[in-house]
Amino acid sequence: MLWSDDENFLYAMEAVSPAVSWKERLLAGDLNPACARTAGQALGMTIAGSWQDPDFEARYGDQRPFDQLRTDPYYRTIARRHPAIAQQVYDWIAQIEPLRLALTHGDWSPKNMLVRGDGLVFIDYECIHFGDPSYDIAFCLNHLCLKGFHMPQHATALHDLARTFLAATLAAAPYEDWKRARLAT
């Protein structure tokens, strides 16, 4: 971070170079499990480090960016265009909206993870909010599994990456507390 202006929601930071997105690496057939593990560990640590923390909730409790950039353009649009599944989509929205558990990136996908040396740099936090981080887990798993349809020759390896990502996330996240919180809703 070079500078920030909190009042006007502005900041400047150094460019990340040289780096290529994990998505680009995946599409090129570079199916490195270390990237999946790192992505999962980072997400799990974010969840654990912000779990039901009132300071994070106060700072990131506004879910309007997530609603404007994810819930409305994707999920409510799906519900409007596909009436046969509309109720299930609206039920899911009603389930996830009130949950305030931990920091949630809102776009935890390989396109927002830059591979740099042995690590990843995570970018694009415009949807971040204090909500239900299971969204991030599902979002990334969805990306990894769907690439198996796009690249059937790598489907098994991509599904293995998804399992590696999930295991690393759950190992770092407060999974038992999470299960109790989800069951209580």
Q: What is the predicted function of each stretch?
A:
Residues 1-54:
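ATP-binding pocket architecture of kinase catalytic cores
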Residues 19-20, 129, 148:
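Feature marks short, surface-exposed loop/turn motifs that line or immediately flank catalytic pockets
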Residues 31-38, 81-84, 157-161:
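Soluble or luminal CAZymes and related metallo-dependent hydrolases
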Residues 38-45, 103, 139, 164, ...:
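Alpha-helical elements of Rossmann-like donor-binding domains used by nucleotide-donor carbohydrate transfer enzymes
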Residues 45-95:
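Active-site catalytic-loop/activation-segment of kinase and kinase-like phosphoryl-transfer enzymes
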Residues 90-135:
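Active-site acidic catalytic loop and adjacent metal/ATP-binding pocket
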Residues 135-174:
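Active-site activation/catalytic loop segments of kinase-like enzymes and analogous catalytic loops
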Residues 174-185:
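All-alpha amphipathic helical-bundle segments outside canonical DNA-binding/catalytic cores
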